[in-house]
């Protein structure tokens, strides 16, 4: 399918062909998107939570109270979980929350996310994401002309330094190189902005032959 290309000045810059296998999926699977997002968020979770267990509490191990005739349970250590100051039973431990997800599932999830943006008419293609000077005001004006206020901008192989500096002062605007494209960042912003170079790299990465 063809989609029009704009400049940062909101002028026409021709059109570009989008691969239907990447951008044209009609039935977007929300369950697949959820799997990929959960995989991404699990990998970034710290997992540094920790409580002291029974064996890590420095309290007396001497038996206290009578063993018989007291009418109460027998206790062999003050570090037992039922006592104040005792160890935590089955408490959290330092661990990694990351889990595996097949590469084909991740690639399919990214294709569904891109198709969802195109289907919702929230995909904008620009010819280039570059500025002569790192001026936030100029970039804000350009985005206003394109009707963009909350967006993820995907550049080519590298992000233009002036563009990145200007964009980082704008709230709700994220800028990533094409290799950093991911499902979570695509879905968390209202609009997806791709450069022509980014589209070419996405096609090379997610085309049917490579998937």
Swiss-Prot record:
Keywords for this protein: Ribonucleoprotein, Ribosomal protein, RNA-binding, rRNA-binding
Disulfide cross-links: none
Cellular component terms (Gene Ontology): ribonucleoprotein complex; ribosome
Pfam families: Ribosomal_L4
InterPro entries per record: Ribosomal_uL4, Ribosomal_uL4-like, Ribosomal_uL4_dom_sf
KW RNA-binding (keyword) present: yes
Superkingdom of origin: Bacteria
Subunit structure: Part of the 50S ribosomal subunit.
NCBIfam families: rplD_bact (TIGR03953)
PANTHER family in UniProt: 50S RIBOSOMAL PROTEIN L4 (PTHR10746), LARGE RIBOSOMAL SUBUNIT PROTEIN UL4M (PTHR10746:SF6)
Family recorded in the similarity comment: Belongs to the universal ribosomal protein uL4 family.
UniProt protein name: Large ribosomal subunit protein uL4
């Amino acid at each position: 399918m063809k989609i029009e290309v704009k400049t940062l000045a909101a002028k026409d810059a021709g059109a570009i062909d989008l691969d239907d296998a990447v951008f044209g999926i009609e039935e977007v699977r929300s369950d697949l998107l959820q799997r990929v997002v959960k995989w991404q968020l699990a990998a970034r979770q710290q997992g540094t939570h920790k409580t002291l267990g029974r064996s890590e509490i420095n309290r007396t191990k001497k038996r206290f109270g009578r063993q018989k005739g007291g009418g109460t349970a027998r206790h062999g250590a003050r570090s037992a979980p039922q006592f104040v100051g005792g160890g935590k039973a089955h408490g959290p431990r330092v661990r990694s929350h990351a889990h595996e997800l097949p590469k084909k599932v991740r690639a399919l999830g990214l294709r569904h996310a891109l198709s969802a943006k195109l289907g919702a008419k929230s995909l904008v293609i620009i010819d280039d994401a570059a500025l002569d000077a790192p001026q936030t005001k100029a970039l804000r004006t350009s985005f206003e002309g394109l009707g963009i206020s909350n967006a993820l901008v995907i550049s080519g192989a590298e992000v233009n330094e002036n563009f990145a500096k200007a964009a980082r002062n704008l709230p709700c605007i994220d800028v990533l190189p094409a290799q950093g494209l991911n499902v979570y960042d695509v879905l968390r912003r209202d609009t997806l902005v791709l450069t022509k170079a980014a589209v070419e790299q996405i096609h090379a990465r997610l085309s049917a032959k490579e998937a």
